[in-house]
Amino acid sequence: MLPLEHKASGRVQATGRGVRASVELSSVLPQQRAAQLQHQKCNTGARLGRDPRRGVDAERTLVCTAATTASVPSTSGASPSGSQLSSKALRPRRFSAPVIARLLRSTTTVQELADLVQQQSLYMDSSHVGIAMLHLALLVSRAEQQAAAQLQLQLAAKQAATRRAGSGASTSGRARGWGSGPGRNGSGSSSVSVNGSGSSSNGSSSSSSSLAMGMQLSMASIGDDVVSGVNAGPVPSGGADALLDLEMSSILDDDDGAGARQLQQMSDDLAAGLEAAATTTAAPEAGVAAAGGTGAGAAADAAASSSAPSLVAAAAAAAAAAASPASSPDVARTLRTLLSRAFSLGLDSLSGPQLAAVFTGLAVLRRPRQQQQQQQQAGAAGAGANAGAGGVGGVGVSAGDRLVAEQLLAAMGPKLYECRPQDLANTLASVALLGLPPDADLRTSFYAAVRQQQRRFGPRELATTLWAYGAMGTYVQEDAVQLVLELSRARLTSFSPLQLAKAVQGLAALRYRPSPEWVEAYCSVLRPALRRMSSRELCAVLLALASLQVGLDGGTRAALLVHTFSGPLPGMAPGEVALSLWALGRLSAVDMDLPALIDLDMSGRVLDLTSRLLAAGGFSGGELQQLLEGLTRLALQPPLEWMQAFVAALQPQLDKLDAQQLAGVLNSLAAQQYRPQPQMQEVVLAATQANMKQLLADTTCSAALLTALRRLNIEPPPGWVGALLEESRSALKNRCTDLHLANLAGSLAAWGVRPDGRWAARLMWRSQVLMNEDRMSPRALVALLQAMVSLGLSPNPVWTQLCLQAAVRRASQPAFEPHHYGTLMASLHALGIQPPQEWLTRMLLSTYRCWDRFSVTHWSSLLPALVLLKARPPREWLRRFEATSAARLADCSALQLLTLAVSLAQLHQLHAAGAVADTPLLLPGAAAAAAAAAPAGASSAAAAGDSPAALSAVPAAAGDGALVPSFMSIDDDGTAAVAAAATALAAAEPAAHAATSTTTATAVAHPQPQLLPQAQALPQPGPEWQAAWWAASTRLLLRVRYAPSELVLTAGWLGSLGLRPPPEWLQACAEVAARYSKVMDAAERQQLAAAVAPLALEAVAPPSAPPAGAASTAH
């Protein structure tokens, strides 16, 4: 770079059209030069006349020549007149205010600006301080851009050479195609940049160099966190969970959707410096930057994925060098001088725009950079550069910078009404960039200023404001967000792709779900803008939409999926491929229909692309975790060869992953039904045990790990379980959510671990707190009850009362699924809890809400549990069940038919009896003792209620603890509960069969006739339901779907319930018995004959009139 005086001389010679005499700097003394300048000024004004453009050029020529007189020789290069200028001490000359402003804007290096500020700092006014601050930030940003671009190209070349030497020509060809070269966003995406012309462009122009643009505005890109910041671990399923940390690589841009703007007046230079400052601190422009990442952080990422130690060291050194321009002594000295001048002038004397300019420049130059350097060093060391990315201002500014910024904010608050929309947006973004929590007065003043100038807010200001709101987090007023959303809704059609990404990413970071109308308008603009989006912007949009959990229309879903798979995905870098698939996977968690849009051709192309990248070794450890998780969420099941290549690429990088990433990898492998090798299991268990405290701090990651271990049938060693119990004590105290609590208890139950009393007490206490605060979801409540049954825990009356209240409160909500009813009631019985009849009635009435969603499996689980709890359903409930379930009996199995028939008959008997005591907590043991102590000679009414064999069979057996449901995972649909209920029915033999059976087969074959009229007098289901049941059972008999044991059990229960089988059922039963006689021994044949004989006798016996209670109960 030429020194200042040489450059000024060149400008003087370039304006020869209006200047006759050339300036000879090597021979003219400063005093003579001043007089000559005055003479030239007069002659130039006379010649140029009233031409404003030529007048400005000539005046600028004189100003630059005068600056040469007072300038100190620069160290950036040798001056032709340096010997003569250094021989005499030059006295700084005071320039006028317009001259100082134009000189500040005309400097092209930090050294020139520093020299000028040092000379003219005493003569600067408030406007000069703002101009100098913004221009300093612009020059530093350009220097960082050039260093980052050069670094990126060097590292890409070294990495390509290393891959070529290690993997051969074919592998190196793929590495060059995916890891180096400019403009790798593919044909389907282009970078939006500033055009050099004054006319507006079509919105999709190619990128150009910032040096060629001069003072033109540059486009700010999405921060590095879009590509690298999300690798901190697995993302929580379900919502909510953890959005990528929004680190603003730039607070200024000129991507206003209408193309570029060219500076045509000198008064716009301030806005130019403001909008162009720091645009390239984290990302070079698309024409130079590599698609794998931008800036020093992406370069360190690329170096970390390479196995060559020399590249790792080079990346670390280059990353430190790329961050050096902002921390150079010249920048620090100039910044200190400008701030001192601003405070000496008095902050009260500065206007609102001037304060905004000073504050914005300070934010760009003094934003926290330590965190970026730590990430780069971690990536260079191979410890996972992408782990643990923090939010804005995570490291924080220094105490001195924070004090200065707070004073500037305090002075700016009352003057925000003077600022333009552009100043307001940049000020808010600067606050977020520095990580300063604004006070209530500043938020109120900013909100009032936005409302005052809401008509002047353009797309650029609206997008920047939303992005800044997301970076600020909780320090945002809801009214302010709603105002910006209302303003942006009408202007979304003017948003550029970058601004669309900024807006939705800010809302996602703020966790603010916009209205459906705003989402509809956003989607209508997003679909045509996808073609102009870069890969980084597309990833940001996908992640934000998935985090917001907004409902997208079918056209937008299809456009996002098809565009990503067929457009930019083949041209993306490996890291962007993994991130795009991971983002689409998160979006599919919100929209369950998204995986159905992937056809075989699309899935084949994706698997082939990722297979080639796996063979080339282009993925880092965190990217591998993202890749597999994204494919799993998209319901893509890779072949065995792909999984083997994935595990081979992951094996060398296991030691680089943290506990969260290991949990995510293991959970994805479990979802793909791929059991890892024992060596990999040991590495995962050892790493998670060493970081158990960190793992349990993230409840989502710990739940994913526990679920993966259970799904893969991996039983951890006792040391690992001991560490889990020890570190989970504090989590049980104050951090565990409902699902995490249930998952933790269920995992211990599945591994057969019985925790100590203190751990169990904390489990009960934490669950009691969650139920008391109404934070226990139905899914977690049911799973927790099952885990408590398996762990052998006994709840106290207070916990039981809260549990019943939480269950009946949640039963009226849509989250309470049909399978929750049966599992909940069976678990209550197994825990020894007897709910009151009022509670049971309210639970049964709540089933009307989801009655149509009950299947045969759900009914087969619920009805036996109601019998065990001695529930008395309302007559209307029984009628409705018979009317709706009669048509579904044809889909039942033999065991389900038996379960429904026995349970429904006993529920009719319980309803007719109406003699069960309504005690809040009646243990099954006490109920059994009360039934045993009842007098033998009871009345007929009591005999029809408590003493009948069919009524006392299942509850008496359950009183001994016969039904203990096995542990069921949170995602189970109730199959385990059905099996448990069927086991209980099979274990409890019919009372009539048990009372008449003896050790000899002859005694079994002769039932007592006096029991038949008593059985026929019992309440029974309606005739229509019985006819449907007999038809379904006969159909199964004709198809030989009854096992011998099921046939014996069915015949015994039918005789005990007093049901009269039709002749066709008896004929089919006889044919099945004849078939089974060939494979059954003598004892089994005698048992089958003894079970069928009472049914044959009952079929030929004359029917007796049912009692009044039975008739009223039936229909």
UniProtKB/Swiss-Prot annotation:
InterPro entries per UniProt: FAST_kinase (IPR050870)
Subcellular location: Plastid, Chloroplast stroma
Region (Disordered): 69-90, 163-210
Main location: plastid
GO cellular component terms listed in the entry, alphabetical order: chloroplast stroma
The keyword Chloroplast is assigned to this record: yes
Keywords, in A-Z order: Chloroplast, Plastid, Repeat, Transit peptide
Entry function: Required for expression of the chloroplast encoded psbC mRNA, most likely for translation initiation. Interacts with the 5'-UTR of psbC.
Subunit structure: Part of a 400 kDa complex which is not stably associated with RNA.
PANTHER family to which the protein is assigned, alphabetical: FAST LEU-RICH DOMAIN-CONTAINING, LD45607P
Name the UniProt record assigns to this protein: Tbc2 translation factor, chloroplastic
